[in-house]
């Protein structure tokens, strides 16, 4: 069964089931430090981060609001249905909007715009990257901040991905990740095109259900592999200035060993 990963919220939930809030503490700390009243989350997906951030924000500020924007209708439908099961303060704080982060126009401004969980990597061309950054900056309130995190290129993985016959890796094996599912595995074959800095991951999702049924879903996912100097140039081109740079969610150095790029920028 093939298609887009973003058209199947169940797969997204299963692959993150072992630690669905792995990156949440960083975003909570950022909101605590900057004290925004209005937050815009781009590529918000199923609301994995949106809802807990709304809960934390409302504890601090009864007027706190967060807007989640995504272009996938299945993801938005899942998020809107899940929102109905959230506590009243979260329901009051959250609004979900459909839109493409390269070109949306909400006609409102935000104290903080965030792009979590490597989502900028799915914007592949320089033209689209600049459009996305410009659009995000245009939605910042005076004194607002723009923040994102990205996976740093793993050179051992890229070397394998350049091979004519790259290996398959099993990178997730989760037991009982959800009711009705006994086991979930994700295997991956990567191919890298250095001319475009595009890593194409062919993902094999195997779902073994409690009733004995099994199914395989195959998805191709293209990632743009960013490098720090490239990010600096893109940000400068749209008038965003990095205020904080680190190599991880806990302030790790941004060096050759960094596994992530975490930027907080002012506009």
How would you name each of these model-derived features?
Residues 130-142:
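A short glycine-rich, Lys/Arg-flanked "PGG" loop and its adjoining helix->strand segment in the class I
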Residues 105-112:
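A short acidic, Gly/Pro-enriched loop at the edge of an enzyme's catalytic core
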Residues 116-118:
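Residues lining the SAM
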Residues 50-103:
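Class I SAM-dependent methyltransferase SAM/SAH-binding core
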Residues 222-267:
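C-terminal lobe and adjacent flexible extensions of AdoMet/dcAdoMet transferase-like proteins
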Residues 148-232:
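SAM-dependent methyltransferase
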Residues 1-45:
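Conserved class I S-adenosyl-L-methionine
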């Amino acid at each position: 069964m093939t298609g887009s990963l973003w058209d199947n919220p169940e797969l997204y939930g299963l692959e993150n089931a072992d630690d669905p809030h792995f990156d949440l503490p960083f975003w909570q700390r950022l909101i605590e430090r900057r004290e925004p009243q209005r937050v815009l989350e781009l590529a918000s997906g199923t609301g994995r981060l949106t809802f807990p951030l709304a809960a934390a924000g409302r504890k601090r500020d009864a007027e706190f609001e967060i807007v989640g924007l995504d272009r996938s209708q299945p993801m938005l439908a899942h998020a809107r249905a899940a929102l109905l099961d959230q506590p009243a303060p979260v329901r009051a704080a959250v609004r979900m909007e459909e839109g493409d982060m390269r070109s949306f126009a909400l006609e409102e401004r935000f104290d903080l715009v965030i792009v979590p969980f490597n989502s900028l990597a799915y914007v592949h061309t320089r033209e689209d990257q600049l459009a996305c950054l410009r659009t995000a900056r245009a939605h910042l309130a005076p004194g607002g901040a723009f923040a994102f995190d990205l996976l740093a290129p793993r050179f051992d993985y890229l070397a394998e991905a350049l091979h004519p016959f790259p290996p398959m890796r099993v990178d997730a094996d989760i037991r009982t990740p959800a009711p009705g599912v006994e086991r979930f595995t994700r295997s991956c074959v990567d191919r890298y095109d250095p001319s475009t800095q595009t890593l194409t991951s062919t993902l094999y999702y195997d779902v073994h259900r409690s009733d004995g049924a099994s199914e395989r879903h195959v998805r191709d996912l293209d990632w743009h592999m960013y490098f720090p100097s490239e990010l600096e140039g893109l940000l400068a081109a749209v008038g965003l200035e990095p205020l904080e740079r680190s190599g991880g969610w806990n302030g790790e150095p941004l060096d050759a060993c960094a596994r992530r790029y975490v930027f907080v920028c002012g506009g």
